[in-house]
Each structure stands twice: as C-alpha cells, then as structure tokens.
Amino acid sequence: MADRPPIDEDRRRLSAWLWRLPVLLATGGAVYGVQLAYRVHFAKVAPADPPTFADAPTVAVAPLARFAAPWASETFALAGLPCVAVRVPEPVPGGKTVGAGDQAVHLIGFSRVCTHQQCIVDLNTDLELVAFAFNHRTDRPTLTCGCHYSVFDPLGAGRAVSGPAVRPLPRVRLQVAVDGGEASIVADGVETDG
C-alpha cells in the first residue's frame, strides 16, 4: 500500500462536533418554539377581580349621550395615557353601570397601550376583519393591536385572547359627573398590577 499521511485526530474531533452543531441548534429552536407557543396560547394572565386603581387627575371623557348604543366608544387621554371608554351590553368587572334595568348603560374603560410591545389598540367592530387579519373568530367587537395582531376582549375585562400579548389591558376607572342636569363620563384612575 502507498504511504498514507497520518490521521489528524484534532481534525477528526472537530468534524465530530460540527455535525452536532445543527442538531443542537434545531433542538434549541424547537424547545424555544414550544415554550413560546405554550406562553402565547395557554399562559395568558386573567384580569384582577376586583381591579386596584391608582388615582389620576380627573379628565372628562364624553357626555353620557354619546354612548347611545352598545359598542359606542370614545378615546381620551388620562395623565398622558391614551385610553378608550366603551359601552358594552353587560356589566364588566372594573366597569361602571349607569341606571338600572333595561335602561342601564354599562361602560368600561381601558388603556389603549398594548401590553405586548406598547403599540396603540383600537376598538374593532368589523368581525370579519378581526377573523381575517387577526386570526381570531369572535361574535362581538374586540380591542385589536395592529402591530403584532394581539386581540383583547372588552367583555372579558380586557383579557388577551389572541396574539402574542399575555397580560390584559389595564382598566381605567370611570365615574359619572352631573353638571347642569347633563350626565358626563369622567376618568380618574388607572389599574395597577396589584
């Protein structure tokens, strides 16, 4: 047999490790993907019941008459925080009910800052758009974040129901103020983490 050069053991060890690198990377990626999927789909945080509010300077939201029908909404700023007040068809923990019986008006206020990446959420009443663009089928309007497609349920006290957000939207404390016989909605507090 012809003379063969000696086998380089260091090179052989390197080759043995090089084939392991893609396997380790793929395994790490799979573990991360499973962990992320679990966190996004099964580890969403429930809103506090009852909520704890931190006081804020009182600001006017809108006259009560502007909330004439369910899902009517008004945006406003509370201490520099973008917020929304929504009339909902039933009472929600942390919300405000004005009146009684069939004439009752149920309102809930939320911060409009998404708990995922701090983008601004909007009340979305187009159910087909929510189903198509946000991949969430629902039978009622939702608060949606167009940045990363998180969806929050106003009747669920702002609970994150779809998308990467796992924490609920902070609720805003709403009150009724009467001035000159006309009822108005004001805001004077924001939910704390507890």
Regions found by a protein language model. Name each.
Residues A16, Q35-F134, P154, P170-G194:
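N-terminal pre-ligand scaffold of iron-sulfur
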Residues D8, I108, G146:
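Short aromatic/basic micro-patch
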Residues T115, G146-H148:
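Soluble extracytoplasmic domains of inner/organellar membrane proteins
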Residues L25-A37:
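Hydrophobic alpha-helical membrane-insertion segments, chiefly the h-region
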Residues E128-G146, R159-L169:
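Short cysteine/histidine-rich metal-coordination sites, predominantly Zn2+-binding motifs
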Residues A2-L25:
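N-terminal secretory signal peptides and thylakoid transit peptides that target proteins
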